């Protein structure tokens, strides 16, 4: 697990470097895979490893992959809320559908697992988890304002630091679905 943690933090930092300094269109893949692996290495030491049960990991990955397809159909194709201006079909499929959505959800899941270890009261979770979801979404979206792997079309409610406010609320919905999945797949102990 130590190697996974080192590799994870290196990939995470590479993702940040690619976004902030190179303005690379593939920064997000490194960022989310690295963030997931790094937090997985921390959480596994605390007795909560998603990797420990391969069937659970693959089920979560597939569920997040399907969720990403549904989000893309509704938000991108039907509502035209965002697009990926520099991606052809192959890169879109690889970096958005296969890597992006599953790993950002796994990264978010690891983040929420880590937080629940510090806040033992389930009452505190009702305050901490929504705030954490918005902060997690903000970090993902703000970093993208330097690289623009995806771009938003004008949306209602305005923007905050280049991020549509409605998108921050959608992150809240996306990441708060994860605790339900955590109960279903037995990640809470």
Language-model features: locations:
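Aromatic-rich, lipid-facing transmembrane alpha helices and their immediate juxtamembrane interface loops
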Residues: 1-189
């Amino acid at each position: 697990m130590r190697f996974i943690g080192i590799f994870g933090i290196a990939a995470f930092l590479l993702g940040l470097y690619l976004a902030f300094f190179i303005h690379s269109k593939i920064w997000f893949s490194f960022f989310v895979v690295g963030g997931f692996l790094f937090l997985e290495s921390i959480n596994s030491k605390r007795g909560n490893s998603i990797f420990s049960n391969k069937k659970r990991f693959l089920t979560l990955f597939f569920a997040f992959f399907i969720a990403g397809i549904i989000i893309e159909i509704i938000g991108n194709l039907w509502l035209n809320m965002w697009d990926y201006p520099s991606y052809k079909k192959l890169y879109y499929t690889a970096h958005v559908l296969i890597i992006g959505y599953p790993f950002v959800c796994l990264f978010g899941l690891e983040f929420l697992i880590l937080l629940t270890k510090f806040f033992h009261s389930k009452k505190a979770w009702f305050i901490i988890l929504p705030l954490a979801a918005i902060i997690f979404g903000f970090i993902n979206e703000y970093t993208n304002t330097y690289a623009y792997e995806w771009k938003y079309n004008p949306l209602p409610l305005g923007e905050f630091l280049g991020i549509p406010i409605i998108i921050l609320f959608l992150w809240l919905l996306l990441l708060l679905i994860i605790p339900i999945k955590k109960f279903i797949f037995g990640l809470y102990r």
